[in-house]
Design a protein with these regions (language model features):
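Short basic helix-loop element that most often maps to the first helix and adjoining turn
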Residues: 5-24
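Conserved hydrophobic/aromatic packing and binding residues within compact polymer-binding modules
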Residues: 7, 21-22, 32-35, 61
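Short acidic/polar N-terminal linker immediately downstream of export determinants
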Residues: 13, 64-109, 113-120, 149-153, ...
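Recognition helix of helix-turn-helix/homeodomain-like DNA-binding domains
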Residues: 27-41, 64-66
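DNA major-groove recognition helix of helix-turn-helix/homeodomain DNA-binding modules
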Residues: 45-60
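Right-handed parallel beta-helix
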Residues: 80-88, 98, 120-203, 264-289
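Short, surface-exposed interaction patches in beta-rich subdomains
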Residues: 141, 200-289
Length: 289
């Protein structure tokens, strides 16, 4: 891919017009047009500005293959997008082996794709971002015949969201492992297949819609955690001293309690602020500590 093609792709992915990009970089719209039609090339100063704006290396901008190793992974692709006001995030990521979603104090949405096996990761996985009023759509597209099975075997995703600009998050993805950390949102809805979940710092209403049997390790949570399942058996592990209200809704659902691997009496606290809730039908939730 040439620099002209890459620049146009990055601009469109970021939802910017040529005028907006020119304003951000500090050049004229005509300069952007020349760059995108391969009739001119930017100075290094402007290349660095573009690199910083889009969160890619200069080598990637110029169409050169990056050989830099990433700690723990052989292949990496990073997409960043500036967020300036509170948003509702609609995130569709398809399949992956592992997903970590975190909140942080910055002002960028960051999607980091990592793999040890997908050598053409940057070409085969593209993150599309659509920014409309009050809403940010993030869509991971698989290209060049990359299958869901290959992604679920070899792809790790790290999603960082700016806590100050989060209203609501809808997350659709199929993974083996999901980790949620240091995130604050009015509501986070997870929809998809998942086997192992770790919640290590979440504030708000968390809902997991999955019909798979799950193991959920909830270490730190303020707010509520709701399971919406059909014909599933899941286990929720809580730390000692974690106070919560347990609620059972839906049809034919059952709540059970365990301590040290043995069945126990209900140890929930009706006066607690945090709520654990089972919805759906014909499902069982074991709450353990």
């Amino acid at each position: 891919m040439t620099f002209a093609q890459k620049l146009k792709e990055l601009r469109i992915r970021a939802g910017m017009s040529q005028e907006k990009l020119a304003e951000r970089v500090g050049v004229s719209r005509q300069a952007i047009t020349k760059w995108e039609t391969d009739k001119g090339a930017p100075e290094m100063e402007n290349l660095l500005a573009l690199s910083d704006l889009f969160g890619v290396s200069v080598d990637e901008l110029l169409g050169r293959e990056s050989r830099r190793p990433t700690a723990g992974y052989l292949y990496e692709s990073v997409t960043e997008y500036d967020v300036a006001d509170p948003k509702r995030y609609d995130v569709k990521l398809g399949g992956a082996r592992r997903l970590t979603i975190r909140g942080y104090e910055g002002e960028k949405l960051r999607v980091r794709l990592l793999s040890d096996t997908l050598s053409t990761l940057e070409a085969d996985c593209k993150v599309r971002i659509d920014d409309s009023r009050g809403r940010l759509d993030v869509d991971l597209q698989r290209l060049n015949g990359l299958t869901e099975a290959a992604a679920r075997e070899g792809l790790t995703i790290e999603l960082d969201l700016p806590n100050r600009y989060i209203n609501h998050v809808e997350l659709a993805v199929n993974v083996n492992e999901l980790t949620i950390g240091e995130l604050a949102a009015e509501e986070l809805e997870y929809d998809g297949k998942v086997q192992n979940v770790t919640v290590d710092g979440f504030e708000g209403a968390l809902e997991i819609d999955s019909n798979q049997d799950m193991k959920v390790d909830c270490r730190r949570l303020t707010g509520s955690l709701a399971f919406n399942q059909v014909a599933a058996v899941s286990r929720l592990t809580l730390p000692q001293g974690f106070a919560f209200v347990a609620r059972k809704r839906g049809l034919g659902n059952s709540l059970y309690f365990e301590e040290a691997g043995q069945r126990a009496e209900d140890f929930s606290d009706p006066d607690a602020q945090t709520v654990i809730e089972l919805n759906g039908m014909k499902s069982e939730l074991f709450i353990c500590r």
